[in-house]
């Protein structure tokens, strides 16, 4: 394979990843199959970086003319519009299932129900409020830090969530599932590039903040995996969305705590 063909292949995989995670229209020449989707997992972190960067740009462009709370809300809105609330939906479904079901089968059945239950609604409202409040506090502390936090959190949270695919069992037996192709034939190259994107984005942060966030994310991933195993024996697409949302919130929390003591 020539260098040009190799670059074209990687660009194609990135676009497949972007098409999976966002509502951004893809070029007509981009074709998606299970093999491509598996290999595209290496770029899930970079898609998060793109979403975070666009959100941060909106925040930076508006924060000089609007109250911090409004600028943060607009930045959050950009993220939701870009993804179609993909991860937020997973968070709500996961909390509905984990909160309302007794057995793993009950939980999986409830999670598949398109209706929003009380557990999911509460989780979704609290998650959005937490993100908004933490980002507002970061914005009041330093607008540059707040924008950087958006970039880092959107990237790192997706890296952590996607890494679960490589070590855990996919438990939903549903051929129409959007996440099932990702559960098959993941390679070490995909994992290496995925993790590297998460580590490199920490360069946006100072040394203590980067180290603190790295250690917390490692511990949080372990905790999330243990909970998923106990609840349903593995993961589904919904639980990956929940993992992303939880990790994003914790990213903001860690950066706020570290920033307050520096």
Swiss-Prot record:
Q: Which GO terms describe its biological process?
A: cobalamin biosynthetic process
Query: Pathway, per Swiss-Prot/TrEMBL?
Result: Cofactor biosynthesis; adenosylcobalamin biosynthesis; adenosylcobalamin from cob(II)yrinate a,c-diamide: step 7/7
Looking at the UniProt entry, the stretches that span the membrane are 43-63, 66-86, 120-140, 146-166, 191-211, 242-262
Keywords, in A-Z order: Cell inner membrane, Cell membrane, Cobalamin biosynthesis, Magnesium, Membrane, Transferase, Transmembrane, Transmembrane helix
Q: Give the EC number(s) under which this enzyme is classified.
A: 2.7.8.26
| Catalytic reaction(s) noted | alpha-ribazole + adenosylcob(III)inamide-GDP = adenosylcob(III)alamin + GMP + H(+); alpha-ribazole 5'-phosphate + adenosylcob(III)inamide-GDP = adenosylcob(III)alamin 5'-phosphate + GMP + H(+)
Q: How does it sit in the membrane?
A: Multi-pass membrane protein
Cellular localization per UniProt: Cell inner membrane
Q: From what superkingdom does this record's organism come?
A: Bacteria
- Short name of any one Pfam family annotated for the protein: CobS
Cofactor dependency: Mg(2+)
Q: Which Gene Ontology cellular-component terms appear in the entry?
A: plasma membrane
GO terms assigned for molecular function: adenosylcobinamide-GDP ribazoletransferase activity; cobalamin 5'-phosphate synthase activity
- Cited NCBIfam families: cobS (TIGR00317), PRK00235.1-3 (NF001277)
HAMAP family with a match to the protein in the record: CobS (MF_00719)
Which family, according to the similarity comment?
Belongs to the CobS family.
Report the function annotation for this chain.
Answer: Joins adenosylcobinamide-GDP and alpha-ribazole to generate adenosylcobalamin (Ado-cobalamin). Also synthesizes adenosylcobalamin 5'-phosphate from adenosylcobinamide-GDP and alpha-ribazole 5'-phosphate.
Q: Which PANTHER family match?
A: ADENOSYLCOBINAMIDE-GDP RIBAZOLETRANSFERASE
| Name the record gives this protein | Adenosylcobinamide-GDP ribazoletransferase
Q: Which organism is it from?
A: Shewanella sp. (strain W3-18-1)
Name the gene behind this protein.
Answer: cobS
């Amino acid at each position: 394979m020539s260098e040009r063909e190799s670059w074209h292949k990687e660009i194609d995989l990135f676009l497949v990843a972007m098409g999976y995670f966002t509502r951004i229209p893809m070029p007509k020449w981009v074709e998606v199959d299970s093999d491509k989707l598996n290999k595209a997992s290496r770029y899930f972190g970079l898609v998060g970086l793109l979403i975070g960067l666009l959100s941060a740009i909106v925040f930076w462009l508006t924060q000089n003319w609007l109250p911090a709370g409004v600028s943060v809300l607009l930045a959050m809105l950009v993220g939701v519009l870009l993804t179609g609330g993909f991860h937020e939906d997973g968070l709500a479904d996961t909390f509905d299932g984990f909160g309302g079901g007794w057995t793993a089968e009950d939980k999986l059945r409830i999670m598949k129900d398109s209706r929003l239950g009380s557990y999911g609604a509460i989780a979704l409202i609290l998650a959005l409020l937490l993100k908004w409040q933490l980002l507002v506090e970061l914005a009041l502390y330093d607008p540059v830090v707040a924008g950087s936090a958006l970039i880092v959190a959107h990237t790192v949270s997706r890296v952590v969530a996607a890494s679960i695919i490589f070590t855990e069992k996919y438990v939903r037996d549903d051929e129409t599932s959007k996440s099932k192709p990702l559960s098959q034939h993941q390679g070490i190259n995909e994992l290496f590039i995925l993790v590297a994107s998460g580590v490199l984005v920490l360069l946006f942060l100072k040394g203590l903040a980067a180290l603190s966030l790295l250690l917390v994310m490692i511990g949080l991933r372990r905790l999330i995996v243990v909970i998923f195993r106990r609840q349903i024996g593995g993961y589904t697409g919904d639980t990956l969305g929940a993992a992303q949302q939880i990790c994003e919130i914790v990213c903001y929390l860690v950066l706020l705590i570290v920033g307050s003591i520096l």
